[in-house]
Amino acid sequence: MAASQKVLVVSLNDKPEYQRILEGQPQTHGMRSGRVYLKPGEACGQHSTKNHEELLVFLAGRGQLQIADLDRFEVGAGKVVYIPPETLHDVHNTGSEPLRYVYCVAPAAGDAKG
């Protein structure tokens, strides 16, 4: 383990707002993470993973993952989604309760710069 990185334990809060978990370098080798809170009807906004892999871990609520203008997947508490590099996507809260999930983004293999 590099001297600049240490084991980190973070408590997730229940506040109705975004929570940063991992900031990226120098805190990690390139991984970033946060907890997202979407109210009913809200979306995170369409964006691309670019040269990163992304993992979504859904904690509460239900929603829909839109991949570009192509596929849609139902998501919610207990679901985990892997999104490969160069994937345009958006998450929408389609339920009547808040949708909460954690995302982890890391450089794809061969791109350690992040």
Residue map of PLM features:
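Solvent-exposed residues in well-ordered beta-strands and their adjoining turns
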Residues: 37-39, 106
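A short, N-terminal "cap"/entry segment at the start of jelly-roll beta-barrel domains
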Residues: 1-32, 40, 45-46, 113-114
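A short beta-strand-loop-beta hairpin characteristic of the jelly-roll/cupin
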Residues: 49, 53-77, 87
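A structure-centric signal for secondary-structure junctions around beta-strands
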Residues: 30-32, 52, 98-99, 108
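Short histidine-centered beta-strand/loop micro-motifs
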Residues: 22-25, 44-50, 67, 73-74, ...
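Ligand-binding loop in jelly-roll beta-barrel domains
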Residues: 77, 85-111
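Conserved hydrophobic/aromatic beta-strand scaffold that supports enzyme active sites
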Residues: 33-37, 55, 72, 80-82
